[in-house]
Regions:
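Secondary-structure junction motif
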Residues: 182-209, 274, 290-298
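Hydrophobic hinge/microswitch elements
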Residues: 127-132, 140, 147, 207-252, ...
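A short LG(V/I)-centered, amphipathic sequence patch enriched
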Residues: 40-59
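Central regulatory/effector-binding core of bacterial HTH transcription factors
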Residues: 89-152
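Short helix-boundary/capping micro-motifs
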Residues: 10-28
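Alpha-helical linker/hinge and terminal dimerization helices associated
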Residues: 42-43, 64-86
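A late-sequence structural motif
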Residues: 177, 253-308, 314
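Acidic, Gly/Pro-rich loop/turn segments at junctions of secondary structure
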Residues: 127-184, 239, 313-314
């Protein structure tokens, strides 16, 4: 029984699939399956089985999960302790939705890093909302920025609001829409496929059929498609403001086509936070950070980011 095997089991159990666990770890599905199979063989129990709506824990798996989670956490803390003893920079791993990654994460982390030159090593990743609490709780990320994450007392996390904004719907400067929202083509970035994101919530509230949704690599590409006049795109109002002023896009003022929302930050509870994570949380409340979230200088496509990986547990 190894740390690799226990980590694979915990992520499959928490995230509900081998695919999601592999994505979180940045490894292949076969690597996760092999680790899980080895653990099953060692313990003589299936631990998790495939059910009608995801993976289901066996009685043995249910008893193993809290203990395995503690061991995974201790392994991550041991890795961090050795890095610190070697004088390595402290890690700050930020995970967010694709929209936040495109516009916010790079300006925020670059400005934060300048305050601690050489002492903090920053990396970033993209995940869907339901995965973020698992990534933070299992020390695969230090900070998550997203819509509000459902509370799970067993994960010992703290979630706080950091920035209010409005989600609107935009289309071409000279609108050519026909029918109602359910008849329009909707252009979204990857967060539009995340039911927990504000974009996902907007599409659900409007009852948009899946066949009317087109997914683009990033938000900027979705806006460009909407500007061509063939459909609409959800947009964070203050991020799209310049395009609205230039007349490239126009707001769609139809019932249900706006949503007041808030970005939240999720970390471990205070007593478990790393120095870098708690410092970054304080930074997010500064005037500089507020300005960057309100008026970021530029975006970085989500393709620049990868889910954070604990390579050491697979070596």
């Amino acid at each position: 029984m190894t740390l690799t095997q226990l980590n694979a089991f915990v992520l499959v159990a928490r995230l509900g699939s081998v695919t999601a666990a592999a994505n979180a770890l940045g490894v292949s599905e076969s690597a996760v399956s092999q680790a899980l199979s080895a653990l099953r063989l060692h313990l003589g129990d299936q631990l998790v089985t495939r059910g009608p709506v995801g993976m289901k824990l066996t009685p043995g798996g249910s008893r193993l999960l809290p203990t395995a989670s503690q061991i995974v956490v201790l392994g991550a803390e041991a890795h961090a302790a050795v890095r610190a003893a070697q004088g390595a920079p402290e890690q700050l791993r930020v995970v967010s939705t694709s929209t936040i990654a495109e516009f916010m994460v790079s300006p925020l982390t670059e400005a934060f890093s300048k305050r601690f030159p050489g002492s903090v090593e920053v990396s970033a990743g993209v995940a869907v909302t339901k995965e973020m609490s698992v990534l933070v709780a299992n020390r695969l990320a230090d900070v998550a920025i997203s819509s509000a994450i459902p509370e799970d007392p067993g994960m010992a996390l703290a979630t706080e609001p950091i920035f209010k904004y409005r989600l609107v719907v935009v289309t071409a400067g000279q609108p050519r829409l026909r029918g109602g929202p359910r008849q329009w083509l909707w252009f979204v970035d990857p967060s539009g496929t995340d039911p927990g994101s504000e974009t996902g919530q907007l599409l659900t509230s409007l009852g948009i059929p899946e066949e009317q949704v087109r997914v683009f690599p990033n938000q900027t590409a979705a806006w460009a498609a909407a500007a061509d006049g063939t459909g609409v795109a959800p947009a964070v109002e203050h991020l799209v403001a310049q395009r609205l002023r230039r007349g490239e896009l126009s707001r769609v003022d139809a019932p249900g086509c706006k949503l007041d929302a808030c970005w939240h930050v999720t970390l471990l509870e205070r007593q478990h936070q790393s120095v870098a994570a708690s410092s970054f949380r304080r930074y997010l409340g500064t005037p500089e950070a507020m300005h960057l979230m309100r008026s970021p200088a530029g975006g970085v496509p989500p393709s620049r980011f990868r889910p954070p990986v604990y390579v050491t547990i697979w070596s």
